[in-house]
């Protein structure tokens, strides 16, 4: 999940590491934003985490919070895993579980 905390270009010697999620900070909380977040997650995690295969990404918006649920399968073990991400626009915090 550290991929999500870095902006692309922020990490020394791994200029392409990170995600574009931080580009969404000023965007209105709309259905279009949900789509953009899904695409940014697929790009970032897909590029850097070859050990998994996505099953689903769900984005829900409630007031200033954006809740993201990522379900994936760990390749080789076929075990299903879950990543829970909450982005709170009111204080610009990103939390993962």
Language-model features, listed with the residues they occupy:
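Immediate N-terminus of the mature polypeptide
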Residues: 1-39, 43, 55-97
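Short secondary-structure junctions
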Residues: 46-53
